[in-house]
Regions:
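Beta-rich carbohydrate-recognition and catalytic domains
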Residues: 16-127, 135-268, 277-341, 355-377
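Bacterial N-terminal signal peptides
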Residues: 2-11
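C-terminal structured domain segments
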Residues: 341-344, 348
Length: 377
């Protein structure tokens, strides 16, 4: 989709007081956090290795969330104890947990989504399936966006389910977009300027809206919309929630809606958070920002991840309006700054509306899952 079909404008508002459109303020519950932690006793017969693995032994983090049958369900990334002791050096699978109150969870003993001997094996092994986001369609289908990682390339994968237990994988979201150029991207750090590697192709949230108290994938101008990206935040469209096309400038480069801001919490780069929410005020995009070393927010540790919010036009998802100058959630507590990413993270990926409150689920230091809540508006 070319930029000619949409338009981009707007100026960031650097306000120090809460803005009326913002979801928040977020507070952490007095008890219960972190809500999901590693369990070395959990084992799973891996279909590729053909042997039992301790699939959630080391880290459980970066959660998606959805409301189903009056409960909150969380799909969380779990890392086993294989591979090497470095970030991304283990195999990731997705576990499932359910809660009646959003804080106390009952967990499945085995992962519900994982690399297997299927047509996505080459994209998902040995790195695994990472960093999920989930939405529900109007007809009750669950659509999962996740990172496929084979330790050489990554992409946003798409999968669907009717029960959160049994999944159909469709492969990369942009597999056939623009001649397949997005399917060939090599891994690169978001700050790497080598153009041969391409645009970082991960982290995707499909736009939703509240319909009778449920967050449902929203259709605008006859299409579904998805904000995606790490390094900058981009936009894509779809007619079926499965096959997606990035919105591009006339020169074929993916449009950039949010970019790094020197002196702010997202000074190194912004990255898409949970599925955005369309409201009368506009589309609220909760996103994660990485603080730059030396040129970032002086009140936030170097390389820390914190969550902020941006607002886009409710009728034109490419029209940027405003974003928060300060994070709405940042690493402050020990469990948010202790783990395999000691610089600290409050990495938001799951957002639900439940019992007239917002529940925001986030990864802590790439190691744990926690929750913060905000009043419903």
């Amino acid at each position: 989709m070319l930029l000619a079909a949409v338009w981009i404008c707007g100026v960031a508002l650097h306000a120090q007081t809460p803005q009326p459109w913002v979801i928040g303020p977020f507070t952490r519950p007095a008890e219960g956090n972190p809500v999901i932690t590693p369990r070395p006793e959990s084992t799973f017969m891996d279909p590729i290795l053909k042997k039992p693995v301790q699939w959630e032994a080391l880290h459980t983090f970066n959660p998606a969330a959805i409301v189903r049958h009056g409960k909150i369900y969380v799909l969380y990334r779990a890392e086993d104890n294989t591979g090497v002791m470095e970030i991304g050096g283990h195999t990731s699978r997705l576990g499932l947990a359910e809660s009646k109150d959003g804080i106390h969870f009952k967990r499945m003993g085995e992962p519900v989504f994982y690399p297997a001997d299927d047509d996505q094996n080459a994209r998902e092994w040995p790195g695994g399936v990472e960093d999920p986001r989930i939405v529900e369609s109007a007809d009750g289908m669950y659509v999962l966006t996740y990172t496929q990682w084979n330790r050489e390339t990554y992409s946003v994968g798409i999968a669907t389910s009717r029960d959160l237990m049994h999944w159909t994988k469709y492969g990369p979201a942009f597999l056939n977009a623009d001649g397949g150029k997005y399917a060939q991207l090599k891994y690169k750090h978001p700050n790497d300027k080598d153009p041969s590697l391409g645009t970082p192709y991960k982290s995707a949230g499909i736009v939703t809206e509240l319909v009778k108290g449920r967050l449902i994938a929203a259709k605008m101008n006859g299409m579904y919309w998805m904000y995606w990206g790490e390094g900058a935040i981009h936009l894509a469209t779809s007619t079926d929630l499965i096959h997606w096309n990035p919105v591009e400038y006339a020169n074929g480069v993916a449009v950039e809606l949010l970019r790094p801001r020197p002196g702010h919490f997202d000074s190194s780069f912004p990255e898409t958070g949970p599925p955005p929410v369309r409201t009368p005020a506009g589309i609220i995009v909760i996103y994660n920002g990485k603080n730059a070393v030396g040129s970032g927010d002086p009140d936030l540790g170097p390389e820390a991840y914190a969550a902020g919010e941006a607002l886009f036009d409710a009728k034109n998802p490419a029209n940027f309006l405003v974003q928060t100058a300060e994070p709405v959630l940042k690493p402050e507590l020990p469990y948010e700054k202790t783990g395999q990413y000691a610089a600290g993270t409050t990495f938001a990926e799951g957002l639900v509306y439940f019992h007239k409150q917002w529940f925001l689920y986030y990864g802590c230091a790439d190691s744990l899952v926690a929750v913060a809540t905000a009043p419903g508006k």
